[in-house]
Design a protein with these regions (language model features):
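Helix-breaking motifs and short loop linkers at transmembrane-helix boundaries and internal kinks
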Residues: 25, 57, 78-84, 95, ...
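Helix-loop-helix hairpin linking two adjacent transmembrane segments in secondary transporters
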Residues: 84, 121-166
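Paired small-residue
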Residues: 68, 72-75, 83-91, 289-295
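A late C-terminal transmembrane helix in Major Facilitator Superfamily
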Residues: 311-349, 358
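Cytoplasmic helix-loop-helix junction between adjacent transmembrane helices
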Residues: 88-127
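Conserved MFS/SLC helix-loop-helix module at the cytosolic interface between two early adjacent transmembrane helices
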Residues: 44-82
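Juxtamembrane intracellular "pre-TM" segments in multi-pass secondary transporters
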Residues: 170-199
Length: 384
């Protein structure tokens, strides 16, 4: 439930963006900025939430983060202009970042190696169900009432999981007795070149995915003139593809190391984004079905990338797993905020800006990983 918090906060309101823009007397572009602001705020929350969790424990960090998330959500519900939405969206995101970073950290507290990768893959299935259902939930709520009720739903969800975790989440990380500063914890992770290779692999993969998430409303509902009712179903096809790839990843982990499967996912993203870029460049009028298929294949590759990059990274830092997870998330979501903003800034009413940025992200990820990891040792626990 905790891992679904951010996918719900990101995707549930996507069908409501045109209505929000009209209600707040602003443009769709300005309303879409709230998505990039959430990604940036989420990154900030993870930066501080990781070391906080490693020092004070998982329960304290989770409770604090969910409280901040609910305060920000309440502010959005009563906002009367887009600038207020931007402000409270950042507050909401910071709380989400502080809370969600604990999910992967708890898994690392209790497992490692291939076991950790399998547990993270199972967690990813839950994460993927959320963006599949979120636009549908948003669409239903939108037809019942208006966009504000979507954020009421998020508030109730945050309060519910906060109560459940308070009653049922055991403490898997005792309060640290040593005084290790946040900067020392991050310096430890940032000085590890092999770990950085995995971190930036996930970073650029997330950047490519958020370029799609940000650009998909204008591409599907604008360029291809798809209705608000059909859009969530097209969006959901990508999530189904990612879930299937994730289930495949769980099976393949019985035979292959996470690092190999990560490379396989990166290669798939490069290939599909290259085909997508070539098609958009050469086709006079791109066909919707072909575009949807290629986008599904690109997003599905995330099922092989995220959990394997995460498990490979945290293997190096058993005592600072939340800090490592926070760095993974914060850099990835910051890159997602940047790529999403670029899609918005370069938007020309065609799929071109979205597709170019997706290809660039897919290509840069494995290149940076290769440069950082050349001659470096890999994790040693993945045979277990």
């Amino acid at each position: 439930a905790l891992t679904a918090l951010t996918p719900l906060a990101i995707d549930a309101y996507l069908p409501a963006i045109p209505q929000m823009a009209s209600d707040l007397a602003t443009s769709i572009h300005d309303t879409e900025i709230s998505l990039s602001l959430y990604l940036a705020g989420f990154a900030i929350g993870q930066i501080f939430g990781g070391p906080f969790s490693d020092h004070f424990g998982r329960r304290a960090a989770t409770g604090s983060g969910l409280s901040i998330f609910c305060v920000g959500t309440l502010g959005i519900i009563f906002s009367q202009d887009i600038h207020s939405v931007w402000l409270f969206r950042v507050i909401q995101a910071i709380g989400g970042g502080v809370a969600v970073v604990n999910a992967a950290a708890v898994i690392r507290d209790l497992s490692h190696g291939k076991d950790s990768a399998r547990h993270l893959s199972n967690m990813a299935v839950i994460m993927m169900l959320a963006p599949l259902l979120a636009p549908l939930i948003g669409m239903i709520i939108l037809h019942l009432s208006g966009w504000r009720l979507i954020f009421v739903f998020l508030l109730v969800y945050g309060l519910s999981i906060g109560t459940a975790l308070f009653l049922r989440l055991p403490e898997t990380r005792k309060k640290a007795t040593e005084r290790t500063s946040m900067f020392k914890r991050y310096a430890m992770v940032l000085s590890h070149r092999c770990a950085l290779g995995f971190i930036f692999s996930q970073c650029f993969a997330l950047a490519g995915m958020f370029a799609f998430i940000t650009g998909s409303p204008s591409v599907y509902m604008g360029y291809f003139d798809i209705s608000e009712t059909v859009y969530p179903f097209l969006f959901g096809l990508n999530v189904i593809g990612m879930m299937l790839a994730n289930r495949l990843n769980i099976r393949l982990l019985h035979y292959y190391r996470p690092q190999f499967l990560l490379s396989l996912g990166q290669a798939a993203q490069v290939l599909t984004s290259l085909i997508l870029l070539s098609y958009v460049s050469l086709a006079t009028e791109p066909n919707l079905v072909i575009m949807v298929i290629l986008l599904i294949l690109f997003i599905a590759s995330m099922g092989l990338i995220v959990s394997n990059a995460t498990s490979s990274t945290v293997e190096f830092f058993p005592q600072n797993s939340a800090t490592a997870t926070a760095l993974l998330g914060s850099i990835g979501f910051a890159a997602g905020a940047l790529s999403g903003s670029l899609v918005g800034l370069l938007g020309d009413g065609t799929p071109w800006p979205m597709v170019v940025i997706m290809f660039a992200c897919a290509l840069i990820g494995p290149l940076v990983r290769t440069m950082l990891q050349y001659g470096q040792p890999s994790p040693t626990h993945n045979h277990s």
